[in-house]
């Protein structure tokens, strides 16, 4: 490296160290070798006789390329910077210093973006997801709180450039919502949203009480991945109870006059899904079946982990013990009860500024 500038040498050493850590965490060498194997497989005529296999291989290839290409580029950029500095002598360093510092910033930015990707190592983190919001104890207050959470998550998803669709929304009798389901489409949507599953508690002076007494409300959030076609879930139609009804808006106003909304109950498990966002009953049924498939698969995975969860002392409980975050508006404080992270900028968080909480949860392996 450059002999006469310790500061530059230290920064390069730090960059190399960060890259090596990322390589280990993201299994760079394994992914790189697997990519070579896939390219060899795709050259075999026999492989192309099986369209389903080609689809599966190409999907895996695209996931590998994303990581391997980024790390390789950062590696090359750092090496190029080292080569440039080694060619320069101390008299010429000032003439290229601005360019060197500019390249440092670009490389550090690329590493930071890749570090975010390294938070998503779960099997389904790369998938899109559904977000269910359900008002809990607290009556009108809880229903208003559920609508605030819906708004918060919609804005956060938009800030991440995800495509969103509110596929079900049941309005409260006075204000707010009783329940809602959001479809969030985009790479790593489930990875970003999954740690939001749990009970969210709101404490505030009630706007619905003449004396503005302090009130505590609860709403639950449940996040589950939208499964791709490669994951099979067998659903027997005889196990389903399908109801159709008219979709209604706030205050009982009908969105349309036909019975296009669909509710499906899976009788063996009691799982209920519903969709009312489209005027087509057929499309709503297809969407509801996608939700049911995702929920059944999630339940299957959870059952496999059940024995391990029983042994854990920190098993989640219903009510107060199930909380993941507390939003205390009159004290201007939002606190994550799992990580201890706090924010006093309440409006920013409720407007979708969740990165502080979510990134900390992901880095803590939640």
From Swiss-Prot:
Gene Ontology cellular component list: cytoplasm
Alphabetical UniProt keywords: Cytoplasm, Methylation, Protein biosynthesis
Gene3D superfamilies the UniProt entry points to: 3.30.160.20, 3.30.70.1660, Release factor (1.20.58.410)
Subcellular location: Cytoplasm
Residue stretches spanning the membrane: none
Processing after translation: Methylated by PrmC. Methylation increases the termination efficiency of RF2.
Sample GO molecular function, one term: translation release factor activity, codon specific
InterPro entries: PCRF, Pep_chain_release_fac_I, Pep_chain_release_fac_I_sf, PrfB
SMART domains reported in the protein's UniProt record: PCRF
One Pfam family matching this protein: RF-1
Function (record text): Peptide chain release factor 2 directs the termination of translation in response to the peptide chain termination codons UGA and UAA.
Miscellaneous note of the record: The gene for this protein contains a UGA in-frame termination codon after Leu-26; a naturally occurring frameshift enables complete translation of RF-2. This provides a mechanism for the protein to regulate its own production.
Protein name, as recorded: Peptide chain release factor 2
Organism: Buchnera aphidicola subsp. Baizongia pistaciae (strain Bp)
């Amino acid at each position: 490296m450059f002999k006469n500038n310790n500061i530059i040498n230290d920064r390069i050493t730090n960059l190399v160290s960060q890259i090596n850590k990322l390589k280990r965490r993201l299994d760079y060498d394994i992914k790189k070798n697997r990519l070579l194997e896939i390219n060899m497989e795709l050259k075999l005529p026999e492989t192309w006789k099986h369209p389903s296999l080609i689809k599966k291989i190409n999907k895996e290839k695209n996931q590998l390329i994303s990581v391997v290409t980024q790390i390789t580029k950062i590696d090359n950029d750092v090496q190029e910077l080292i080569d440039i500095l080694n060619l320069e002598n101390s008299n010429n360093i000032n003439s290229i210093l601005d360019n060197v510092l500019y390249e440092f910033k670009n490389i550090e930015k690329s590493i930071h973006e890749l570090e975010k990707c390294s938070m998503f190592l779960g099997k389904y983190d790369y998938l899109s997801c559904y977000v269910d919001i359900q008002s809990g104890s607290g009556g009108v207050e809880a229903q208003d709180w559920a609508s605030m959470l819906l708004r918060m998550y919609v804005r956060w998803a938009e800030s991440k450039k995800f495509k969103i669709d509110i596929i079900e929304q049941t309005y409260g009798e006075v204000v707010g919502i009783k329940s809602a389901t959001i479809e969030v489409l985009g790479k790593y949507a489930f990875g970003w949203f999954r740690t939001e599953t749990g009970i969210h508690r709101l404490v505030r002076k009630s706007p619905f009480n003449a004396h503005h007494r302090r009130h505590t409300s609860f709403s639950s959030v449940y996040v589950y991945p939208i499964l791709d076609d490669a994951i099979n879930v067998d659903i027997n139609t005889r196990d389903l109870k399908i109801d159709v009804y008219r979709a209604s808006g706030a205050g009982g106003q009908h969105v349309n006059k036909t019975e296009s909304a669909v509710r499906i109950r899976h009788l063996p498990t009691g799982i209920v899904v519903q969709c009312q966002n489209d005027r087509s009953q057929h499309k709503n049924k297809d969407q509801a079946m996608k939700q049911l498939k995702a929920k059944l698969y999630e339940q299957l995975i959870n059952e496999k982990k059940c024995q391990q969860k029983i042994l854990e002392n920190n098993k989640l409980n219903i009510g107060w013990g199930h909380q993941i975050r507390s939003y205390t508006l009159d004290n201007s404080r939002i606190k994550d009860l799992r990580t201890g992270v706090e924010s006093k900028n309440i409006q920013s968080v409720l407007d979708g500024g969740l990165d502080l909480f979510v990134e900390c949860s992901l880095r803590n392996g939640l």
